[in-house]
Amino acid sequence: VSLRSAQGIYSFIDKERYNLYIVEMQGNRWEVVLPSGEKTPIDRNDFSFTENGEKKNFDFAYITIHGTPGENGLLQGYFDLIGIPYSSCNVLVSAMTFNKFTCNQYLKGFGIRVSESMILRKGFEILDEEVINKVGLPCFIKPNAGGSSFGVTKVKTKEQIQPAIEKAFGESDEVMIEAFMQGTEITCGCYKTKDKEVVFPITEVVTSNEFFDY
């Protein structure tokens, strides 16, 4: 998913104005893809690399990583430390919005209505009846901190609750159990620069599956 996002953005940026490089990050493997297709390591001290014997530094990072470390503030904090500007929101906003339960509690403080939910941490158990009494069925059981729709299950029956919890724990140390909300799903993208704020048209999310996923 992350690589597809990167390739999409790469295809739209003007190559006459910018020297573009895709950097692949997987665990401790950080590599930049050179025009030849060869991959060379990134120096994590300053996010630089060497090409044809010449050291090259980045002027800007366009973050397209779905999940950690691209959406939870870790990569943003790293770029802040070494002084490289980047796309996406800052450390605080990234960390808070990546944690679904924390984000919902924050929104509640502003009087925004959110689905009823509960948090379950690894090592603790919960009875099926507790889930049903708290959020009802159907409900969504999902990793509390996770990208895209990995580990997410729409639970319709009591028998599906524990397998869904186990699946979600495979992606995160915390699981969020959330009441199902019937309605029209919409999304609205926006971005802010030094000079302006741009809000894109509201878009309805339509899927042939049980819920929008990858």
Which ranges hold each PLM region?
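Short, hinge-like loop/turn segments at secondary-structure boundaries
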Residues: G37-T40, Q105-K108, N133-V135, K158, ...
